[in-house]
Structure formats: structure tokens, C-alpha cells
């Protein structure tokens, strides 16, 4: 039987639902809304396997902050009411047949990337449910990303329209242009348009740096900030080598075994 693994970026979904609630202390409303959302996702995707990946709730910013100390340094903590309600949310999702993968220091995106890659490389179908465009660097013929809230696929045509690049160039793009929301600086003075110009001419940061054809207007910037660009690319990239501690059989979706109705 063909495999279709659905991976839910849990906090990406939960935080958006929570922020839309009139009373953000009402965790039951979050549970009700997210379970309805999950039921719709199950109906639309028809997974054979499914898991929800949760980020750790601590302020530890992980290995990325060791490389770039300013990485997400102003990240707001999870609202207290939501943090206290996480166990209840996970329990409600469990009753729908969805197990949770809880990170222990690793960022959820690396756990998602590792699991998605492990399955996709065997030519099995993987769908990531998230609005996070960072996952687009993982795109492959059998790996896709669904933005549930905008009802769109974050696929190769989306990447071409949004960035003008191939998915495999996105980490280099962010290494050059940076990601302001995460305090990934990139090369000062190289914004999205310049990064696109460079990566249209050269496939990678290294290729651009090593070429005598790099436009003069960028040469000084590269000479002064090349190492920063490499570090920023590393931080913007996704790890796919995290030890997960379970196998695919453990997250097989069995419809109705833990039925939870709303």
C-alpha cells in the first residue's frame, strides 16, 4: 500500500488559531477549533500515517543561536494560558488518532524536516501542514507543503512566483538577504532583489564568491561579509539528521480508533 505521511507543524497551527480567539484564555475554544481543523485536514489529505510535531516551550533557542547569538533573541514566550493548555490540546488530538512528537531542545522545523526527508527519499508521499515558507527548501516530487489557512500549496511554482528561484536555492537566498523576523542578517546591503540577481547568475553563495564575473557592486560586500552569509545560510537551512526514536509503523493513522467528535 502506498504511504502518505502527513506532518502537522503543531504550534504553527495552534498559535494562529489561538491568536484569532476573542478570549485568548479560553483554551477550550482553541481545542474545539483545532480539532475541527484537524478533521478537515484528515478528510482532505487521507493520510496513511500522521504526526503532530511540537516545538519545545522553553526559551532555549538551540544550535542556531550558538552560530548566530542574535537568532530569535526577541522571540515572545508562549502565552501562559496556552502553555498550560498544551497537554489538553495534545490529548484532544490523540483522540483523533494523532500522536505528538515533542522536541527536546531541537526546533520543530528540524524534526519535521528529518522525518519528511526520511520518507520522501524513498519516493513515498509526504505533506507538511504549515504556513512556514522555510519548509519550501525541502520540496521534491513526493514532498509538498500545504498552507491550510490560505488554502494553497507552497510548491515549486509558488517558490518561482514568490522568490524567482528553485527550492534548493532558498537557503542561499536567505543567507544573502537574511530573514529579519528571525534576526538572520545576511549580507548587509544585499536585499531580496540583489540576492535574486546573484542567484540567477550563480547557483550558490560559494559559486558567486569564487567567480570573477560577480558584479563589482557586490564584490566588496562579499569580501567583507562572505563568512556571515555562509553562517546565515546554515541557520536558515534545515537539519535532516535528527535522531527521532521511532519508526513509521508507530505513527500509522487508524481512523476512528480514538474517536473525538466536536
Swiss-Prot record:
Per UniProt, K(+) binds at: 176-177, 187, 190
Cofactor(s) listed? Mg(2+); K(+)
EC no. given is 3.1.-.-
Task: Tell me yes or no: is Nuclease among this UniProt entry's keywords.
Answer: yes
Highest taxon listed in the record's lineage:
Bacteria
One of the Pfam families matching this protein, by short name: 5_3_exonuc
Which ranges carry the 5'-3' exonuclease domain?
A: 165-255
Any note on cofactor binding?
Answer: Binds 2 Mg(2+) per subunit. Only one magnesium ion has a direct interaction with the protein, the other interactions are indirect.
Q: What is this protein called?
A: Flap endonuclease Xni
The species this protein belongs to is Aliivibrio fischeri (strain MJ11) (Vibrio fischeri)
Amino acid at each position: 500500500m502506498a504511504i502518505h505521511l502527513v506532518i502537522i507543524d503543531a504550534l504553527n497551527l495552534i498559535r494562529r488559531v489561538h491568536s484569532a480567539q476573542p478570549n485568548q484564555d479560553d483554551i477550550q475554544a482553541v481545542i474545539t477549533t483545532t480539532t475541527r481543523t484537524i478533521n478537515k485536514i484528515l478528510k482532505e489529505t487521507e493520510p496513511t500515517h500522521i504526526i503532530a510535531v511540537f516545538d519545545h516551550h522553553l526559551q532555549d533557542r538551540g544550535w542556531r543561536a550558538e552560530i548566530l547569538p542574535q537568532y530569535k533573541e526577541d522571540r515572545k514566550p508562549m502565552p501562559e494560558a496556552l502553555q498550560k493548555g498544551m497537554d489538553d490540546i495534545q490529548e484532544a488530538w490523540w483522540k483523533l488518532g494523532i500522536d505528538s512528537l515533542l522536541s527536546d531542545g531541537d526546533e520543530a522545523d528540524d524534526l519535521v524536516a528529518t522525518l519528511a526527508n526520511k520518507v520522501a527519499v524513498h519516493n513515498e508521499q509526504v505533506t507538511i501542514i504549515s504556513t512556514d515558507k522555510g519548509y519550501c527548501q525541502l520540496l521534491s516530487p513526493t514532498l509538498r507543503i500545504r498552507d491550510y489557512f490560505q488554502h494553497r500549496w507552497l510548491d515549486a511554482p509558488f517558490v518561482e512566483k514568490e522568490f524567482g528561484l528553485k527550492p534548493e536555492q532558498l537557503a542561499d537566498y536567505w543567507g544573502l538577504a537574511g530573514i529579519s523576523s528571525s534576526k538572520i542578517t545576511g549580507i548587509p546591503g544585499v536585499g531580496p532583489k540583489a540576492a535574486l540577481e546573484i542567484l540567477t547568475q550563480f547557483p550558490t553563495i560559494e559559486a558567486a564568491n569564487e567567480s570573477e564575473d560577480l558584479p563589482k557592486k557586490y564584490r566588496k560586500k562579499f569580501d567583507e561579509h562572505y563568512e556571515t552569509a555562509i553562517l546565515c545560510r546554515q541557520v536558515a537551512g534545515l537539519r535532516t539528521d535528527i535522531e527521532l526514536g521511532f519508526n513509521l509503523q508507530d505513527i500509522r493513522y487508524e481512523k476512528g480508533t480514538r474517536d473525538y467528535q466536536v
